[in-house]
Amino acid sequence: MASFAQVINPMTGQNTWQERGDDYDYHQEVANAGFGDMLHDWERNQKYDAAIRKTIAGMRQAGKQVHVLDIGTGTGILAMMALRAGADTVTACEAFVPMANCAARILAANDAAHVRLIRKRSTDIVMGVDMPHRANLLVAELLDTELIGEGAIGIYNHAHEELLTDDALCIPARATCYAQVAQSPLASQWNSLKILPDLDGDILLRPPTQLLQCSGEAALHDVQLSQLPPHSFHVLSEPTQIFHFDFQRKQPLELMRENVVRVQLSRPGSVELVFYWWQIELDDAGEQLLSCAPYWAHPELEQLKATCKDKQRPLANIVPWRDHWMQAIYYIPKALHLHDAGEEFWLRCYHDEYSLWFDAHKEQPEKPARRHSCTCDLHMTYTRNRIGQLNQSIRNKRYLAYLEQAVQSKSAHVLVMGDGCLLGLASAALGAASVYCLEPHRFSRRLLESVVKHNQLKNVKFLDSLKQLEPNELDTITHIFAEPYFLNSILPWDNFYFGTLLLQLEQLHQKLPANVEISPCAARIFALPVEFLDLHKIRAPIVSCEGFDLRLFDDMVQRSAEQALSQVEAQPLWEYPCRALAQPQQLLSVDFANFGVEQSNHGSIKLTAEGNCNGIALWVDWQLSPNENPKSIVSSGPLEPVETGQYVKWDMFVRQGVHFINQTTAEKKYLNWSTQFRPLLGELNFNFSLNANREKSE
């Protein structure tokens, strides 16, 4: 039986009712569960298997029976490894019922049906009811990028108290967390608002005092650190061990700790960031190590380089790829400026039950500090990408080149549409006679109001909705400006909401003022067939893993993805290298002066470079003015002209769209595509297929 759910359409801004099957939430959760890329992580799988084999063999040699508990079994892969290695009994628990049901089928298909499967959280297991006796070997994968963010501390503490014997071993046995302090003008753009200069370098807008004094958010910024351009940062110290977790310890793991570490500077600089990762010892002897370090700090880099068969693979991608365990950036609340190599400072490291945070001091701190949080609205309102976008110099210069020309007469009256549009406020600083700023979001508006006050801008009026714009005010408007950026947008073309607002303005006032100038005046969507090095694995079928048949898992995920996932998903492609297999092709062009026009287009792209086309990258180019000057284009795609067969350099402050292709592409040299755009309904649909022949024109 179908039901209806209310969903906001980012392109129209309207809540719409969507018909969904009763099991839609189930399919959505399955499709987004994220088990897939873990099972493509060959290093993780091989080292878990080796540790399980070695540990069980050692317990057998010591004359012990082996009773295994697998917490969070997922597909059952670790439980099957334990059974294959000779465990006497194996109990697996999985609280996510769809996954547990799938695990039961996978266990049966792999002759492992006598694994005891409990459809509960481990913390809900009752000894004597769910398990006949305690286990003496715990195998689990309870970790995330922060190590402890999925509740590992509490789960291990409960397991030792209620489910394990006193001499139980654990796989993994131990974990060590590492921190490396760094300075990066690029990464700092993700955390603070910089001065906005005009094209001559003179100051247009200064950040308010509360922004400069704000400590920011303590939360991690998870990224693929290895993909940071080497020239964009300097590490200021060697990696430092900050926390150690002994998962085999019978005594409870501490829920909160502080560790103040003395760090020596390897070069002068500003301590702005902490690069963070962890390493686990899977077996008790510590022989099976798995490190999440970026390539420059990876303990096995030389060995991995020697064994890598792809000699064209970039150095940053030699280390095993994984998207479930990445690295993280933590931002120091107040940068510490140090001038001499060899100088020492104190790095304060904290963790609670689920998260970490950091601070840095010149002198050893005497009192513990509370976890810091945003007090300026910037960090709590905008994503890291958006904060970086606000600071993006080349991007801002293109908008300012348009705005300086637009308001040069000093009689310009500007209507600004978009969330957190500082560039719109810049038009007031450039001399616009008046600026009307549509800003319906409370925190975003409060932030912009503080910018107006701090910079003493006298000619700015904020609007909660377009209905507040009086007819006489609308009649004076000479320019309508947007970046565009809206908080509800996920995919690049969700920002076509700008066109919806233009239509609303026409409906409210019958027509737009004569000769009003709209910027951006147009937008174009481009597509590029690519070969991802690794990103495609998040949607690629597993088939088999360490000798176990996982096709039932593939089938379940595929069925759910078809019902719950979008054709295109948003990804920050700078973190995921890919090679271009052709030149980009335009799929759709939108004229914002005639936004309501429906369109259907189709075409073909010939793949001219060797490679396996496993994805299509999509982005939007915004045309700020009608002239064809390339500098009037702001792109959310490649930063440099695309070279077929070469890696693409992507914008680092926006997410692009990605359509994944899970089919064999040998002998298929044409990407046939079609688009259907229905702006009044907020619908933009894509269809892609790889074929041996070009699509015939109608």
Swiss-Prot record:
Its EC number is 2.1.1.-. Signal peptide: none annotated. It comes from the Eukaryota. One of its GO terms (molecular function) is histone methyltransferase activity. It is an enzyme of class 2 (transferase). GO terms for biological process: peptidyl-arginine methylation. Residues 14-357, 366-698 form the SAM-dependent MTase PRMT-type domain. Keywords: Methyltransferase, Repeat, S-adenosyl-L-methionine, Transferase. Essential arginine methyltransferase that can both catalyze the formation of omega-N monomethylarginine (MMA) and symmetrical dimethylarginine (sDMA). Specifically mediates the symmetrical dimethylation of arginine residues in the small nuclear ribonucleoproteins SmD1 and SmD3. Belongs to the class I-like SAM-binding methyltransferase superfamily. Protein arginine N-methyltransferase family. PRMT7 subfamily. This is Protein arginine N-methyltransferase 7. It comes from Drosophila mojavensis. The gene is Art7.
